[in-house]
Regions:
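Charged, low-complexity intrinsically disordered terminal segments
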Residues: 1-337
Length: 337
């Protein structure tokens, strides 16, 4: 059986060491691909240009002496691996594909992430082939059995689902926001939101009479490290200050993260749509700088997935059977992003 595991360089701290779980996979005969940064656009072109010309030739060998920034008890890192980190490139996808089903998720398979809030969709059918194709583009080895995989066609489905990656996620979000009119609802649940064009699109939708609701992470915790609330708190406080009809609630975290990435478009005169997966609503995640995978679904309102998403959102918005969210005023923050 072919098993292919594709991951980001972050897991080996950009060449400073081979992470123990990755080593176990390799020893067990599983093909591991560490995503090559060269396949990803430069999100920080000034630094990346300098890095490519002056530093890249040095490589990033193992055997460092610097404390691990992500795991103080973990292996030491090198100066070269830290300099490679500063390119800020990432394979941020979270997908699983078997011959039976596929999963696209916002969740990392990571012990410290186990308490986070996330969303995922499991599906089968022809969309699995598109997902496989997008992943095989990242590996050098040829896998004829995987490449030739044909998913069983669905006899009947009440959901139209397509796999979207990188900039196509941005296009799907902006297109759905732009077509929303008075009487429609846009419900967003998000870990990071800061893209200016997207925020402006939401502001314009609100002015058209669209009900815009946003549940966002407070950006105050990251694996035991206290953060300053950026980008969400200043970005959304400014958005509401200029557009008071937009409704924002913070997900009240207690050391964990609200790691969800979901946009739910509840149109009054047509089927709803949902976009969910790995992509945060930031420039790096949406404008072809990170590798990202989402799905866009067209959802009939008598279908199970429509009801599941609607009930999920209303439950945490209204604090049904628990305390999940708080008003924006509790953590309102002046500032400009």
């Amino acid at each position: 059986m072919d098993i292919v595991f594709i991951t980001d360089e972050l897991n080996n701290f950009y060449g400073a060491y081979t992470q123990r779980n990755i080593k176990k996979l390799m020893e067990g005969g599983i093909d591991v691909t560490i995503t090559n940064q060269k396949q990803i656009r430069d999100s920080n072109p000034l630094y990346s240009g300098f890095y490519k010309f002056y530093l890249n030739w040095m490589g990033s060998p193992e055997g460092g002496r610097i404390r691990n920034l992500f795991d103080p008890k973990g292996p030491k890192i090198t100066v070269r691996s830290f300099l490679r980190l500063l390119n800020f490139k990432a394979n941020h996808r979270k997908v699983l594909v078997t011959d039976q089903r596929a999963i696209v998720s916002s969740s990392n398979p990571h012990d410290p992430s186990s308490n986070h809030s996330n969303v995922a969709v499991s599906f089968y059918g022809k969309a699995m082939e598109d997902l496989i194709k997008s992943e095989l583009g990242l590996v050098e080895k040829d896998y004829p059995n995987i490449k030739s995989f044909k998913a069983e066609a669905l006899e009947k489905s009440d959901v139209d689902l397509r796999v979207i990656t990188e900039g196509k996620i941005y296009d799907a979000l902006r297109e759905n926001i732009s077509k929303a009119e008075k009487g429609d609802k846009i419900n967003i649940a998000i870990f990071y939101i800061a893209d200016r064009k997207l925020l402006n699109d939401l502001a314009e939708a609100s002015k058209r009479g669209v009900e815009v609701n946003i549940i966002a992470d407070l950006n105050k915790d990251a694996f035991g490290i206290e953060k300053n609330g950026s980008p969400n708190r200043p970005a959304l406080s400014e958005l509401v200050d200029k557009n008071p009809d937009i409704n924002v609630r913070w997900y009240e975290t207690h050391g964990e993260q609200f790691h969800t990435k979901l946009a739910f478009f509840d149109f009054s005169n047509e089927d709803a749509r949902a976009v969910l997966g790995s992509a945060n609503f930031t420039r790096r995640n949406l404008q072809n700088y990170n590798l990202e995978t989402d799905v866009e679904m067209i959802l009939p309102k008598d279908g199970k997935i429509y009801k599941d998403i609607k009930n999920y959102y209303e439950r945490i918005w209204n604090n049904e059977n628990g305390e999940y969210t708080v008003p924006i005023e509790k953590y309102y923050e002046d500032g400009i992003i």
